[in-house]
Design a protein with these regions (language model features):
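Large intracellular
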Residues: 19-163, 237-287
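Alpha-helical transmembrane segments of integral membrane proteins
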Residues: 2-9, 34-38
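N-terminal start-of-chain detector that recognizes signal peptides
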Residues: 1, 62, 71, 222-223
């Protein structure tokens, strides 16, 4: 939503401001298509040459994140607190045997079935199930600090992979000004081949070449770089829910009372997604 609004404002102010000061938009509009063939084609080729199909799919998904925004809302954070707390309470009161069916087959679990949105996130499900599976097979003898280190390593690996679209967008932003110069230089070369033409024609050709530099800079700093920043924000926002999972599991393994465990996890959530104290503890009653 805001990305689309930002694009409209950006293009409106740049081209509208130019027209408002008496500039003629027609030469720019006529030059943009062939300049964009060079700049866009070169950028596309560079991205394809430097990445595998997996990264290219992630790159496309990065644009979706820019316009869609974060996946998880306040209700999802409330649900993940309920889900993990229920499993940890079951592990503590009923033992590993009670929790094992739920972590071995989450899709058939009556606990996970209450949270279909969370069940769609395979990273979240694996984080919960793999960690609890580790606790179950160790018969509760694991050092909580060691479990935390294992979870941190897994989350770092996931983040390194998830943040790649933002890095690719930023790399594109860094390259676009240079690709704009490439288009401009080619335009100048073309102009030099027509040096015997009248000044009016040469001026139009030089102006057309300069549109390449203009487009490269505009695309880099007006679109690609802001998109990269927004993509990074969305990825980091969605990753916060995994920290809630870790907080509840580790605090429970340390033997802290469940209310303290839940409040520690709740208070660590950003205010925009943080469930109210009453919502959490009223919802936990009877679970």
């Amino acid at each position: 939503m805001f990305a689309a609004i930002g694009l409209i404002v950006l293009l409106g102010m740049v081209f509208g401001g130019f027209a408002f000061t008496g500039g003629d938009l027609r030469p720019i509009m006529e030059s943009i298509p062939h300049e964009m063939i060079i700049i866009g084609g070169a950028a596309t080729g560079a991205i394809v040459a430097g990445n595998s199909m997996k990264e290219l799919k992630q790159f496309g998904g990065g644009f979706g994140k820019v316009f869609k925004g974060p996946t998880y809302k306040k209700q999802d954070y409330l649900d993940v607190i309920f889900l993990v707390s229920t499993l940890m309470k079951m592990l503590r009161t009923d033992g590993p045997v009670a929790v094992e069916p739920h972590i071995e087959d989450p899709k058939a679990s009556t606990v996970f079935a209450n949270y279909p949105r969370l069940l769609k996130d395979t990273t979240l499900v694996h984080l919960i199930c793999d960690t609890l599976r580790l606790v179950v097979v160790s018969s509760g003898t694991l050092d909580p600090n060691a479990v935390e280190e294992v979870m941190d390593n897994g989350l770092k690996t996931h983040h390194h992979d998830a943040i790649r679209p933002a890095d690719m967008l930023q790399g594109l932003a860094d390259a676009l000004p240079a690709l704009g110069i490439v288009a401009a230089v080619l335009g100048v070369v073309k102009t030099m081949g027509s040096i015997d033409k009248p000044p009016a024609i040469l001026g139009a050709m030089i102006g057309s070449a300069l549109v390449g530099t203009f487009m490269g800079i505009l695309l880099a700093y007006g679109i690609a770089s802001p998109f990269a920043n927004r993509c990074k924000q969305v990825i980091e926002s969605d990753a916060a829910i995994y920290q809630v999972v870790k907080q509840i599991i580790i605090a429970s393994l340390h033997g802290h009372p469940l209310p303290l465990v839940i409040e520690a996890a709740r208070s660590g959530i950003t205010h925009s997604n943080q469930p109210a104290f009453a919502d959490v503890f009223d919802g936990m009653r009877g679970r």
